[in-house]
Regions:
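Conserved H-loop
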Residues: 28
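Catalytic core of pol beta-like nucleotidyltransferases
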Residues: 1-22, 31-36, 46-119
Length: 119
């Protein structure tokens, strides 16, 4: 299982690569139920034009390469969407309803100090 410091190290890496507006931790780590097989689930919200599958794949590849470069061994699922895409998914009972209702905001661009929150 990952310590809070390891989670925030990975969140920092994602924020550096993607330059998002907000990052939400969801799944077992956000809900306090992680086990040895748990990975980190992050919903990364970056406003602008909607992300295509190719756009998301390019950013996910950049996160993967930066993670390897820094020898960070975190297992993860990162979903990169716009606010509009998340809202549409939530309205249709999609994958991000749970993240929006129960997830923890761990990064937000508008935070004046560092953008990061404690988890």
């Amino acid at each position: 299982m990952y310590k809070n410091e390891e989670i925030m190290q990975f969140v920092n890496l994602v924020a550096e690569v993607v330059a998002p507006d907000r990052i939400i931790l969801f799944g077992s780590y956000a809900y306090g139920t992680p086990n040895e097989k748990s990975d980190l689930d992050l919903l990364v919200i970056k406003n602008g034009k909607d992300f295509s599958v190719d756009d998301e794949a390019k950013l996910s590849t950049a996160v993967y390469l930066k993670r390897k470069q820094r020898n960070i061994r975190t297992r993860y699922d990162v979903f990169i969407q716009t606010d509009r895409q998340v809202r549409m998914s939530a309205e249709n009972g999609g994958a991000f309803v749970d993240a929006m209702q129960k997830g923890k905001v761990v990064y937000e661009r508008t935070n004046q100090e560092t953008g990061f929150y404690n988890i």
